[in-house]
Amino acid sequence: MADKSYQPTLAGLRAFAAVAEKQHFGSAASALGVNQSTLSQALAGLESGLGVRLIERSTRRVFLTPEGRQLLPHARAVLEAVDAFTAAAAGASDPLQGSLRLGLIPTMAPYVLPTVLAGLAERLPALTLRVVEDQTERLLAALREGALDAALIALPAETSGLSAVPIYDEDFVLALPPGHPLSGKRRVP
């Protein structure tokens, strides 16, 4: 009979999932980077704590019991959740790792991308950059919906509800030939 307060260990769940996938103790142990004895102990502890046999062993074969087949998707879901939690924690401590979805307006892309991409893989090997080129309004909508992490846009733009950080200010001038009607004006209407 299982102890109702039993909490499976991650080692036990990983051992169970690996043996189920590999259907071989040696291969499962190798995949987890442990020896066979450690793997067997972790699996035995899980089975004992749950009060059910998960794996049947024969001289030639390893296979799941009906209970093992029923519980395997739950074990995998727990392991995926723990792995996602760990990855999120790593990403939270280092915002320059993981995935960055960057939006750019088409007029900026040819100027910004070569500078941004040059040496990026060497400087930030844990960062995966995905670039989306679109118009300002659609980029802002994608930011608000969570489809982008950041966007380089031109102002003025409606950025309420977002953080907007100016990165540079560039003056543009209109060059005209001598005698043009707009020549000598301080502002272009």
Curated annotation (Swiss-Prot):
Binding region for DNA: 25-44
Every HTH lysR-type domain range: 8-65
Keyword Secreted: no
SUPFAM superfamilies per the UniProt record, alphabetical: Periplasmic binding protein-like II, Winged helix' DNA-binding domain
InterPro entries noted in UniProt: LysR_subst-bd, Tscrpt_reg_HTH_LysR, WH-like_DNA-bd_sf, WH_DNA-bd_sf
GO CC annotations, alphabetized: protein-DNA complex
Gene Ontology MF term list: DNA binding; DNA-binding transcription factor activity
Keyword DNA-binding part of the UniProt annotation: yes
Keywords: Activator, DNA-binding, Transcription, Transcription regulation
Family: Belongs to the LysR transcriptional regulatory family.
Function: Required for the induction the katG gene for catalase. Involved in the response to hydrogen peroxide.
Protein name per the record: Probable hydrogen peroxide-inducible genes activator
Lineage per the UniProt record: Bacteria, Bacillati, Actinomycetota, Actinomycetes, Mycobacteriales
